[in-house]
């Protein structure tokens, strides 16, 4: 389980990205890089980390499911992820 402060920081970044998305796009299209650099650093989409929605783990996250590899395997074996089953050939 990731620290609550790390998860909260990432959520705060997501909110900032959403808030400044239109303004960033407008400034990029205008080529005004001076004004773009004045915006908060955390309003850039590259600062947001994909995290597991259950554990907050930041590595080994399947973006399609929003789960880390550990939780994905656990839930898939329990049959709790629709359409996912163990491979057999």
From Swiss-Prot:
The keyword Ribonucleoprotein applies. It comes from the Bacteria. Belongs to the universal ribosomal protein uS14 family. The gene is rpsN. Keywords: Ribonucleoprotein, Ribosomal protein, RNA-binding, rRNA-binding. GO terms for molecular function: rRNA binding; structural constituent of ribosome. It comes from Prosthecochloris aestuarii (strain DSM 271 / SK 413). GO terms for cellular component: cytoplasm; small ribosomal subunit. Binds 16S rRNA, required for the assembly of 30S particles and may also be responsible for determining the conformation of the 16S rRNA at the A site. Part of the 30S ribosomal subunit. Contacts proteins S3 and S10. GO terms for biological process: translation. This is Small ribosomal subunit protein uS14.
